[in-house]
Design a protein with these regions (language model features):
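Acyl-donor-binding surface of acyltransferase catalytic domains
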Residues: 1-8, 78-82, 91-159, 289-291
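A short beta-loop-alpha structural element at the N-terminal edge
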Residues: 8-28, 162-174
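Conserved donor-binding loop and adjoining core beta-sheet/short helix segment
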Residues: 33-36, 43-104, 216-228, 233
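Flexible, substrate/cofactor-facing loop regions flanked by secondary structure
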Residues: 38-44, 157-225
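Conserved acetyl-CoA-binding loop-helix of GNAT-fold acetyltransferases
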Residues: 95-109, 232, 238-251, 255, ...
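Conserved hydrophobic beta-strand within the GNAT/NAT acetyltransferase core sheet
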Residues: 118-121, 227, 261-265
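Conserved active-site alpha-helix within GNAT-family acetyltransferase domains
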Residues: 122-140, 239, 243, 267-285
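C-terminal "cap" of GNAT-fold acetyltransferases
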Residues: 143-161, 259, 264-270, 282, ...
Length: 298
């Protein structure tokens, strides 16, 4: 994992900001449970995974010992570079913008020079009152889709296509495929793919002539499935590989006797939306904006 780093900030508030340590785990959990405003980035990492890394800071009241009162926390991490996400944010007071601003200033004052973007996946309304003031701007929207049954639409796969469960040794190749297929903020690293491989409901790879050309992984919960990722090698897109992977995923859900499936996709990814709608997915009406901060080069 790569993290944004080097705390610094407003001279009147920066003295309250320090890097989070493993000793802050209990305070962080308290904030996540009891905080007025809480954000946790949804992926395969847990919030505690980022403790002790540069870019995860806390705002404290009292002295500088690990036992002082932690009033807020903010963690930013890149996995992989060059884009970072806001991984966790929590404050115990609704009037805590100044605290958040001090933590944000501390983090972005001296980011890892390889970080080109810091993005916030907005799942609640409260960050929208702060993001513009912190210097972020809206860059994308994620749409949610749902399918109430698990039937597959007719499709024609390319000759010789084979789909099977992914092997751990294939994950670095799949990470390279991610880098080729997506802009930085949406990519998974080999480490993130490993976490998905360990925890997912299904993780399938599509092969042509023995070489990976696409993959999907899914999660389950509440009696349903969630298609968490679908990636196809850019030069192979439009050849039926995504449809074949989707059909195989639906077959796996049926075998597990799941009921329905959800997925998310970017509003500007029209090709994926056409595929999902052809398979019977419909928009749920839920939309999630993405805001980003772009450090000034140099």
């Amino acid at each position: 994992m790569q993290m944004a780093n080097r705390p610094a900030g407003d001279p009147t508030l920066s003295r309250h900001v320090r890097r989070a340590t493993r000793a802050d785990a209990g305070a962080m959990q308290r904030l996540l449970r009891m905080g007025v405003y809480v954000h946790v980035h949804v992926d395969w990492h847990l919030p505690g995974d980022w403790l002790g890394t540069p870019g995860f800071v806390v705002y404290t009241r009292g002295d500088d010992s690990p036992g002082e009162r932690v009033a807020a926390c903010l963690g930013i991490g890149a996995d992989p570079l060059p884009a970072a996400w806001v991984r966790v944010a929590a404050v115990e007071s609704a009037a805590a913008f100044a605290q958040c601003e001090a933590m944000w200033t501390a983090i972005v004052a001296d980011l890892d020079p390889d970080i080109e973007e810091v993005a916030w996946f907005v799942t609640d309304n409260w960050p929208l009152h702060w993001l513009d003031r912190l210097g972020l701007e809206p860059v994308s929207t994620v749409l949610s889709f749902r399918k109430g049954d698990l039937t597959a639409a007719p499709y024609t796969p390319p000759p010789g296509l084979d789909i099977r469960p992914a092997l751990i040794e294939e994950l670095p190749l799949l990470a390279e495929m991610e880098a080729a297929a997506f802009e930085p903020r949406w990519r998974h690293s080999a480490q993130s793919l490993y976490l998905a491989w360990r925890q997912s409901l299904s993780f399938d790879v599509a092969l042509l002539d023995g070489q990976p050309v696409g993959f999907q992984f899914s999660t389950g919960g509440g009696g349903g499935a969630h298609l968490a990722r679908m990636t196809v090698q850019p030069e192979r897109q439009g050849q039926g590989i995504g449809a074949a992977l989707l059909a195989r995923a639906l077959e796996g859900y049926r075998q597990r006797k799941l009921r329905g499936v959800t997925l998310n996709t970017q509003a500007d990814n029209l090709a994926s939306q056409r595929l999902y709608e052809r398979f019977g997915f419909a928009p749920t009406g839920h939309e999630y904006p993405v805001w980003s901060y772009y450090p000034t080069p140099g």
